[in-house]
């Protein structure tokens, strides 16, 4: 019975050792892959950093202020365009009224001229 226990313990220890080796190998592979990807990402980050210069906060603030200034100017222009469009509509309406009045005046004159000739 002691031999069976010893054999069983040895078998369990071998299983533990095999399992530990498997886990160690898997962990080493995962760490290696992680290290490679980390290294690749660091290289890529450096490549990006060189290619695209990151602006400092003062420069970003200046850009935001310029953008806001341009938006304000655009809004002012849009309001002027709206004003001139309305003014144009009113002028067209006035022109139409003047044409009608001119025709009425012409008709009156023509009637008046025809009455004075008789």
Curated annotation (Swiss-Prot):
Swiss-Prot/TrEMBL keywords: Coiled coil, Endosome, Transport
Cellular component aspect of the GO annotation: endosome
Family: Belongs to the BLI1 family.
Coiled coil regions, renumbered to chain: 55-104
Entry function: Component of the biogenesis of lysosome-related organelles complex-1 (BLOC-1) involved in endosomal cargo sorting.
Protein's gene: BLI1
Record note on quaternary structure: Component of the biogenesis of lysosome-related organelles complex-1 (BLOC-1).
Protein name: Biogenesis of lysosome-related organelles complex 1 subunit BLI1
């Amino acid at each position: 019975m002691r031999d069976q226990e010893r054999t069983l313990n040895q078998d369990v220890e071998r299983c533990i050792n095999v399992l530990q080796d498997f886990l160690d190998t898997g962990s080493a592979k995962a760490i290696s892959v992680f290290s490679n990807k980390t290294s690749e990402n660091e290289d890529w980050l450096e490549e990006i950093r060189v290619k695209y210069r990151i602006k400092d906060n003062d420069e970003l603030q200046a850009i935001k202020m310029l953008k806001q200034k341009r938006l304000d100017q655009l809004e002012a222009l849009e309001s002027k365009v709206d004003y001139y469009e309305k003014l144009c509509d009113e002028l067209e309406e006035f022109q139409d009224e003047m044409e009608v009045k001119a025709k009425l005046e012409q008709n009156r004159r023509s009637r008046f001229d025809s009455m004075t000739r008789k």
